[in-house]
């Protein structure tokens, strides 16, 4: 489903996502005009690329919960050296957490890995491969 994500930052930014890929970036007005039938998600916070988690994953009772802890932080990728445990790597794959060696970027054609951050730096929402995987209540 085609979805446009917008943040509340200045200058305004909108990212159009179709499936798991970014199809357009620009001002909310430009992107909405290009995709008038798209669903629009308006987020309160700064929309940008997800974070690359540089260190070991947070401790939690299960591998799934360790990966989910990253999603709550706005991380959309982790380094391979921190995913060597088979259960942890499997949980990362099931959740589409990217294994990266550099921070993700927002560009047309790239995988839609986005995050929205509030003014205090806390994560409002995380999108992995076009799918909303975390939303703060």
What does each model-found stretch correspond to?
Residues 78-79, 115:
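Hydrophobic residues within beta-strands of alpha/beta enzymes
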Residues 28, 57, 82-85:
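Short, ordered loop/turn segments at secondary-structure junctions
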Residues 80-105:
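Active-site loop-helix segments enriched in His/Asp/Glu that coordinate
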Residues 1-34, 99, 105-106, 110-119, ...:
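N-terminal metal-binding scaffold of metallo-dependent hydrolase/deaminase domains
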Residues 73-77:
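Short acidic/polar active-site loop segments enriched in Thr and Asp
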Residues 38-40, 125-132:
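Short, compositionally biased
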Residues 68-71, 107:
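Alpha-helical segments flanking ligand/cofactor-binding loops in enzyme cores
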